[in-house]
UniProtKB/Swiss-Prot annotation:
Organism annotation: Bacillus cereus (strain AH187)
UniProt-listed GO biological process terms: protoporphyrinogen IX biosynthetic process
Record key words, sorted: NADP, Oxidoreductase, Porphyrin biosynthesis
Reaction(s) catalysed (UniProt annotation): (S)-4-amino-5-oxopentanoate + tRNA(Glu) + NADP(+) = L-glutamyl-tRNA(Glu) + NADPH + H(+)
Keyword DNA damage: no
Extra remark beyond the main annotation: During catalysis, the active site Cys acts as a nucleophile attacking the alpha-carbonyl group of tRNA-bound glutamate with the formation of a thioester intermediate between enzyme and glutamate, and the concomitant release of tRNA(Glu). The thioester intermediate is finally reduced by direct hydride transfer from NADPH, to form the product GSA.
Chain positions recorded as NADP(+) binding sites: G189, A190, G191, K192, M193, G194
Biological function: Catalyzes the NADPH-dependent reduction of glutamyl-tRNA(Glu) to glutamate 1-semialdehyde (GSA).
UniProt comment concerning the protein's domains: Possesses an unusual extended V-shaped dimeric structure with each monomer consisting of three distinct domains arranged along a curved 'spinal' alpha-helix. The N-terminal catalytic domain specifically recognizes the glutamate moiety of the substrate. The second domain is the NADPH-binding domain, and the third C-terminal domain is responsible for dimerization.
Protein name in the entry: Glutamyl-tRNA reductase
Native organism taxonomy: Bacteria, Bacillati, Bacillota, Bacilli, Bacillales
Binding residues annotated for substrate, in chain numbering: T49, C50, N51, R52, S109, E114, T115, Q116, Q120
Amino acid sequence: MHILVVSVNYRTAPVEFREKLTFQAAELEQAMTTLQNQKSVLENVIVSTCNRTEVYAVVDQLHTGRYYIKKFLADWFQLEIEEVAPYLTIFEQDGAIDHLFRVTCGLDSMVVGETQILGQIKDSFLEAQQVKATGTIFNELFKQVITLAKRAHSETTIGESAMSVSYAAVELGKKIFGELTDCHVLILGAGKMGELALQNLYGSGARKVTVMNRTLSKAEIMAEKYMGHAKPLSELQCALLEADILISSTGASDYVITKEMMTKVEKMRSGRPLFMVDIAVPRDIDPAIDELEGSFLYDIDDLQGVVEANRAERLKEAEKIQFMIEEEIVVFKTWLSTLGVVPLISALRDKALAIQSETMESLERKIPTLSDRERKVISKHTKSIINQLLKDPILVAKEIAAEEGADEKLALFAKIFDLEMEDVESRAEEVEHKRAWTPSVPSL
């Protein structure tokens, strides 16, 4: 088995392409179910955010797995593989494990150290478990990753200087307008990104805030928390007339604000500039609006310059977290290496129990007067003897499994105990294809 990551992210793909490969939240479960039925794929978790779409998979063959995951992405988004391939980054084995740890800890984020990705990874993992797309390996790996990410943020100060993308948008607005107290701010979208932006705006002094959303009740709930006003999207054109700053993150599939709409609005704004930040993927605002004289549009990729400000301090903390990651990878790989010895141990236990069972049958034939209580006591004690005898050999087998040249040593181990290798290999296949669905996961 092999661990594989196929990624399209902000480092290698512009927003124009990333928005073509973005899974909507409502379709993630179906996507993971579909991928699970692809050739070579044994387990999978799909993570899709504004900055990345990544497929994490356990595959039986690397080459075949790579191909069918690429094909799945191309088919799902109705693209040709040739269109998708140039923007994909592939991580394999140790690189894939390290990448998952780094992403979940926020070290691979546009804003190093942000914590939003941890929640997104956890949500995707839980959804994958719900559709039984994860098995023995990912159930262990993702739990370990989530636990470490929580510890990394609690034991370092990386989160204190880190910014989310929505906070970066607010910082950009402050650089342009200075104080935000007198600015009229318009928020499009009442989801997580919109609320994060509003939290940061409120913390930066903004008090004239309007929240708009397709579902007005959601906008009202969010606006009430921060003493803002809520309006339906049907009044968008009027709201654009009043706004100084617009931050948009609706998750709509088409442009919410078109160039045609903004051209009409500009004529009525009497030359007042409008600062617009589009942090949605796919984008909410037609990029052609940036051509208009009074509109200043920034998308999610433009925020890179803002997030660089605190990078030096965050990188110091990131080094500490990377060390923690490397230690944790050793722990996971040790666990992973012992998976191969599980069938051997199982075969050893079964053989010992078979001997114990045969001995009990022989004893009962020779001493037919044994009472039920006496049989239970003898059976219990003979099993105890077996467990004591097997304890050290099993520990040694696990240690051998983590060493180089483990296959030859374990074969000798099997020979010493006269274990049938065909039986061991049969058990190994069962373990390899096992789908151990265990929904327990560390809470955030």
